[in-house]
UniProtKB/Swiss-Prot annotation:
One matching Pfam family: UQ_con
InterPro entries xrefs: UBQ-conjugat_E2_core, UBQ-conjugating_enzyme/RWD
UBC core domain ranges (all copies): 15-178
Organism: Drosophila ananassae
Taxonomy of the source species: Eukaryota, Metazoa, Ecdysozoa, Arthropoda, Hexapoda
Region (Disordered): 216-266
The name this protein goes by in its record: Protein crossbronx-like
Family named by the database record: Belongs to the ubiquitin-conjugating enzyme family. FTS subfamily.
Length: 266
């Protein structure tokens, strides 16, 4: 009995690890200008960084962490997204630096949601902050704005004094670039490090791309990269993306679970 319980726990951990790895594969495949990777210490703690190239927040670089619940992805509890630095935004708490996921997610559903959905939402709130605080239109045609957000000061300034809001965000962008090359806050081999451009290293890398061995290693998937997703697209495109990603996730999970069974058998 004791051995059976231990074996079941081990199997559950292995399956969870492979599911998280499958999620990481989808993240690599789906988005640009936002990056996330599980930490070396725990698959439930992800490091992330976003480079904003359009909208009010253009020119900013923000680091963040994603904390997954213990029973991810089976738990309905939402993951937690926490930024490393304070960011002035209606959906980001000025004290905890956490992002409100409520406007897009009510609960986590493993058959519908994936980590790349979180990253896409993060891109959306920075690309279109005005759109992220609107819930629809009134019968008269006026936009209906959320009345409960993580940062009421940011909400009021964005709604009533947009020029002042933009000025504040421009200062934030300058500050974020100033800290772009800061040393890692945590000692983890998977922490995302940004380094200044080095011409010599760039030329060396470009030469490597020309080598036959490199082309052979990278020709497995010749599909075009996903375009930058600066905002939530139409429901039709979301449905197409979802169907495509579900197929890839199912294939990846099947292969990885086969590997998990082999590991337990050994």
């Amino acid at each position: 009995m004791w051995y059976s319980i231990r074996n079941n726990q081990r199997m559950a951990l292995i399956k969870q690890g492979y599911k998280i790895l499958a999620e990481y594969r989808l993240v690599q495949d789906h988005l640009k200008n936002i990056y996330a990777i599980p930490s070396y210490a725990s698959g439930l703690h992800w490091f992330g960084v976003i480079f904003v190239h359009s909208g009010i927040y253009a020119g900013s670089m923000f680091r963040f962490s994603i904390l997954l619940p213990e029973n991810f992805p089976d738990d309905t509890i939402l993951p937690t997204v926490i930024f490393n630095a304070a960011i002035f935004h209606p959906h980001i708490c000025p004290h905890s630096k956490s992002l409100d996921l409520g406007p897009c997610f009510k609960e986590w559903r493993k058959d519908q949601h994936h980590i790349w959905h979180l990253l896409r939402y993060i891109q959306a709130v920075f690309a279109d902050p005005e759109g992220s605080i609107c819930t629809g239109k009134s019968p008269s045609g006026d936009l209906v704005v959320l009345d409960e957000v993580n940062n009421l000061e940011a909400l009021n300034m964005l709604a009533k004094s947009r020029p002042e809001y933009i000025k504040r965000i421009q200062e934030l962008a300058i500050s974020s670039r100033r800290h772009m090359y800061d040393k890692p806050m945590i000692e983890d081999p998977h922490y995302i490090i940004v380094e200044p451009y080095c011409a010599e290293r760039h030329l060396r890398f470009m030469e490597q791309l020309k080598s036959p061995s490199w082309r052979e290693a990278t020709c497995e998937d010749d599909s075009p990269p996903a375009e930058l997703l600066g905002h939530i697209d139409s429901s039709r495109q979301l449905d197409e993306d979802e169907a495509n990603q579900r197929g890839k996730l199912q294939a990846a999970t099947t292969d990885l679970q086969h590997g998990a069974r082999c590991s337990v058998a050994q």
